């Protein structure tokens, strides 16, 4: 239980930390997006996945999603919570793919308890372009 004033202090601390992290991650996201675009420009199919430590509402996610599709958005159900510790519940693990793939059946496997992240997976059907 937080004492009077403590909740506000904790909120300000969290917002400050999130802002600092966003400033560091923005150039990283832009670098990844440029790298991905080089392959897309060569018509190379792309799958990009991992622990991005950023929610679907983040600058990082928006930057990557300009070039690639979020497979969970395309074929998942519900919030898709992949991080589940310390009272924080977000989808910060992502699978992205180019238009060369159709995603289906995206899920979070919340039966795995050995990590603070649940695995996220989906099926991808390759659909080559003519």
Please name every model-derived segment.
Residues 2-22:
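A solvent-exposed, charged loop/short amphipathic helix patch at secondary-structure junctions
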Residues 26-47, 52-130:
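Metal-dependent phosphoester-hydrolase catalytic domains
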